[in-house]
Amino acid sequence: MEQVPLGKQLKSVSNLFSRHLNQIPLYHEGENLTPMQRMIIVVVHEKSQTQDVFQRDLEKFFSIRRSTVTGVLQLMEKRGLLVREPSTQDGRLKRLCLTDQANALFAIIQQNLQEAEALLCQGLTKEEIAFFSTILAKMEQNIR
């Protein structure tokens, strides 16, 4: 059997994972939240417990371009999910703060992501998951 290129496999799994998340309806003001919006809510919620979160943090965390993050954040601001407030340490920077509406969605989003992650890892041992995570981290470093 011929080996399928790893890049194709990674892209395929990523697409299927996003599609799965899109099939779990989570509406805010009549519009379904995208997987990226959901993950941003989780990351900002969790990281803001211990530190200010800035746009550049999301760029690094998700390995996406500034313009991509800007577009997603602007839409989330428009929809009342987050606001940008001046940083207490550096007034030039704007920290990301979730609104009460986004915080109310956090538990549901967290549950959805945990269920999707469980489905993704179904049939894998803890050792296989740890090994795969190590391999992915190495691949990420290779391509940076």
Which residues fall in each region the model found?
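C-terminal regulatory/oligomerization modules of transcriptional regulators
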Residues: M1, E127-R144
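N-terminal leader segment of winged-helix/HTH proteins
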Residues: M1-E31, R79
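N-terminal positioning helix adjacent to the helix-turn-helix/winged-helix DNA-binding module
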Residues: E2, L6, M36-I40, F54, ...
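Short amphipathic alpha-helical elements of helix-turn-helix/winged-helix folds
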Residues: L16, V43-K47, I135, N142
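N-terminal helix-turn-helix DNA-binding core of bacterial DNA-binding proteins
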Residues: N22-R65
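Short, hydrophobic-biased segments on the C-terminal half of alpha helices
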Residues: Q55, L73-Q74
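Charged, amphipathic alpha-helical coiled-coil/dimerization segments
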Residues: Q74-S133
